From Swiss-Prot:
CC annotations in GO: cytoplasm
Descriptive protein name: Inorganic pyrophosphatase
Homology family: Belongs to the PPase family.
Entry EC number(s): 3.6.1.1
Pfam families cross-referenced by the UniProt entry: Pyrophosphatase
UniProt-listed CDD domains: pyrophosphatase
Principal place of residence: cytoplasm
Organism, as annotated: Neurospora crassa (strain ATCC 24698 / 74-OR23-1A / CBS 708.71 / DSM 1257 / FGSC 987)
Gene it is expressed from: ipp-1
Amino acid sequence: MASQYSVRKVGAPYTLEHRVYIEKDGVPVSPFHDIPLYANAEQTILNMVVEIPRWTNAKQEISKEELLNPIKQDTKKGKLRFVRNCFPHKGYLWNYGAFPQTWEDPNSIHPETKAKGDNDPLDVCEIGELVGYTGQVKQVKVLGVMALLDEEETDWKVIVIDVNDPLAPKLNDVEDVERHLPGLIRATNEWFRIYKIPDGKPENQFAFTGECKNKTYAMDVVRECNEAWERLITGKTAPGGVSTTNVTVQHSSSRVAPDQLPPLPPNENLPPAPIDSSIDKWFFISGASA
């Protein structure tokens, strides 16, 4: 499947000004609202938006608040956020991103995790062999899901693989991941458990004692979050600070014609700004398994 999507990069990476906009056939679109969740009629292949390529550290995410929801680097107290390297890991273990047209509703408490949603699109870990790029739209299939409890919020992590990956035909459920990629599920659990410790935070907790639930459970989570997004985009749920402006969702009162949007800055494709060498430091966490 050739991608219809391209990226427009504004500002230099690793700066507060950096934004990655998504365009479809040259028209700016929202990666949150305009890219369809499902890539085929059978709803077995899904679109994901890559925010953070594997082995990188910059914590980039779809901006919920900004017009057209560009991808930007997250900040804390005005400083750009980077995840630390917890031995033996380097940056993120997977191509990390989000499912479009999904939302973890902060007004809703999940009956099994007993925690509310985290007010973000659904997080996705793509485990294929190719390193993606920020703003890439991949076609993936769902394999399983973990439920991280992050500061008393449910933060689902859906495990997927690019349908074009050589291993994709062999991976159809979570037990196939363990069979063909032994250790990856355990390492994924460990990574999410410890990654905030170098920043002085406690280790994260999981629902289901850290178990990775199977594909059927994961697809139910995806559907629930898609339904929550439907309520958001149609105004049945108050958006809070979320920008719901879009150019394609016919039944949304926030839809605008592309020519009504303010012009975006031109594509710049600037070299990355220098980052502090401490980002490369390895942190050794007691209780982490090598």
